[in-house]
Structures are given as C-alpha cells and as structure tokens.
C-alpha cells in the first residue's frame, strides 16, 4: 500500500540525513564519523533537519555571493 511505501522511503531518507550530518559534523570537529555518530543518533529529527537546511543554505549563499562578484 501507499502508506507502507511512504514510511519505507521516509525511513531511508532519515537514515541518509543522519549519515550526512554525522559526516559534516565529523569534518567540522576533526573527529571520525564513528565518534560523532552517537551524538547524531541522540539528536531529534527536527535538529537533524535543521543541520541539513543550514548546511545547504550556507552552500547556496556561498555560490550566490561568488556569482555576484
């Protein structure tokens, strides 16, 4: 059914977002992904989404400012 397909896709998306946030935080803090993973797993879905939005928002702003120069 559509409901089970949606839940499956949503769970996969959440897993991918957690992996991305762990990778970004590890790079920022200079730690391994495994060390940061526990911190990311403890975060709420809302916090993870905010990290994703802020990361891509910064990238978009940097690209926009480069194109305006």
From Swiss-Prot:
Tissue occurrence: Expressed by the venom gland.
Disulfide bridge map: none
Gene Ontology biological process terms from the UniProt entry: defense response to bacterium
Record keywords, A-Z: Antibiotic, Antimicrobial, Secreted, Toxin
Gene Ontology cellular-component annotations: extracellular region
Location of this chain's protein in the cell: Secreted
Gene Ontology MF: a single term: toxin activity
Purpose: Insecticidal and antimicrobial peptide. Has insecticidal activity against larvae of flesh fly S.carnaria. Has antibacterial activity against Gram-positive bacterium B.subtilis B-501 (MIC=1.25 uM) and Gram-negative bacterium E.coli DH5alpha (MIC=2.5 uM).
Family statement drawn from the similarity comment of this UniProt entry: Belongs to the cationic peptide 06 (cytoinsectotoxin) family.
Domain notes: Both the N-terminus (1-33) and the C-terminus (38-69) of the mature peptide form alpha-helices which probably disrupt target cell membranes. The linker region (34-37) probably derives from a processing quadruplet motif (PQM), found in propeptides of many zodatoxins, hinting at a fusion of two originally separate membrane-active peptides.
Record-given protein name: Cytoinsectotoxin-2a
Organism: Lachesana tarabaevi (Spider)
């Amino acid at each position: 059914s559509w409901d089970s397909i949606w839940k499956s896709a949503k769970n996969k998306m959440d897993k991918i977002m957690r992996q991305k946030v762990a990778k970004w935080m590890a790079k920022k803090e200079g730690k391994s992904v495994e060390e940061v993973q526990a911190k990311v797993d403890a975060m709420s879905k809302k916090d993870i989404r905010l990290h994703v939005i802020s990361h891509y928002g910064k990238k978009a702003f940097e690209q926009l400012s480069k194109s305006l120069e």
